[in-house]
Amino acid sequence: MRVSDFRFDLPESLIAHYPHPQRSGCRLLSLEGKTGNLSHGVFTDVLDKLNAGDLLVFNNTRVIPARIYGRKASGGKIEVLVERMLDEHRVLAHVRASKSPKEGASLILGEDESVQATMIARHDTLFEIRFDDERDVLTILNSIGHMPLPPYIDRPDERSDKELYQTVYNERPGAVAAPTAGLHFDEPLLEALRNKGVEMAFVTLHVGAGTFQPVRVDNIEEHTMHSEYAEVPQEVVDAVLACKARGNRVIAVGTTSVRSLESAAKAAKDALIAPFFDDTQIFIYPGYQYQIIDALITNFHLPESTLIMLVSAFAGYKNTMNAYNVAVEQKYRFFSYGDAMFITRNPLAINEKVGEE
C-alpha cells in the first residue's frame, strides 16, 4: 500500500482560509459506506441523519494559543510552537530558528518581550522549555501566544480565530490544532439534537502539531504515527456499551474521536472497550478492523495524509477517493475551515484492495 495511492488533485482555490459565516451553515457531503452513494446538502442535515438513541462522541479539547514569537538572548529570532504542557512552568515545543538554541540558552518571548524562558533539554525534535515566570503556562500563553493555524491557512492569525478555531463545547486546554469536525456544531444544533433524543459523550484528545506532518515513507505500513494524549473516561465507555446494547449507532465527531475510541477498544483486555488515559499512536489505514464506530462526521483531509487513510479504512478506498474527486468537482471547501462529510461504515472495506481498479 503506497502513500501515492491516496493522492488526489486539489486546486489551491478550494482550501478554506476562513470558516463559513455560520458554524452549521457549511456544505455536507454524505457517503453511504455500503453502496458508495453520495448526496449533497448542508451541515444541519445531520439532524435528519441521526436517530433518537444514537450516540455522538465529541472531542472536548481546547486549542491553546500555542505559537509564540521571540528571540534568543544571544540574538536571532525564534518561533516557538508548544506541543505539550508538561506542568505549570514547562512545555515541550517545536522551535524554528536560524540556529537551534543550546541547552541552558535564555529566550525572550512575546512581541513585547515580557516573558523570560530557558531551554532546558532537547528530546529528539522537541525542545523542553521552562518559563521563568511566576505565572503558569496557560496564563502566559493566553497573554502572548497566537492561535496555531494550520500551515495551509496562509495568513496571520486574527483575533476572531480565538473563537472560530474552537468548538463551542471545548473544556480541556491542551490542543495545538482544533478537532475541526466539531467546529460545525453550534448551540442551536446541539439543542435540536438533544431534543430529538440523540445522546452525547465527550472524550479528550489533545491534537498535536504532528497531525500536519506528511507521511515520509513510500510504504505506509512503515509509517510511525506521532503520539498524542487521549482520555476515554468510564462514562463514555458506559454510554458506548449502552448504545450498542439498544441497537443504536455510535457516531464519531472527527478523526480524533475515532482514534480515542478505537485506542480504548484496542487497550481493552476482555471487553469491547475500557477506560483509556494514555498516549496513543494508533494508525488506522485500510485493512483495519473498526471496533466501535458506526458513522463518522469529518472534514476533508489532505492528499496522502494519515487521515484520508483512516477514512478509507472506514468507508472503503474506492468510495473515499471517488467522494473526494466529486467534492473537488463540486467545489467543496477543504481542510480545517472547510466543509464536512457524513459517512456510514462500509463493512466490506476491510477486504478491499487499495490502488486496484
Swiss-Prot record:
Top-level EC class: transferase
Family the UniProt entry places it in: Belongs to the QueA family.
Pathway: tRNA modification; tRNA-queuosine biosynthesis
Assembly and interaction partners: Monomer.
Intrachain disulfide bonds: none
Enzyme Commission number(s) from the entry: 2.4.99.17
Keywords in alphabetical order: Cytoplasm, Queuosine biosynthesis, S-adenosyl-L-methionine, Transferase
Molecular functions (GO terms): S-adenosylmethionine:tRNA ribosyltransferase-isomerase activity
A biological process term (GO) from this entry: queuosine biosynthetic process
Example of a GO cellular component annotation carried by this entry: cytoplasm
Protein name per Swiss-Prot or TrEMBL: S-adenosylmethionine:tRNA ribosyltransferase-isomerase
Xref: NCBIfam families: PRK00147.1 (NF001140), queA (TIGR00113)
HAMAP family for this protein: QueA
PANTHER family associated with the record: S-ADENOSYLMETHIONINE:TRNA RIBOSYLTRANSFERASE-ISOMERASE
Annotated Pfam families: Queuosine_synth
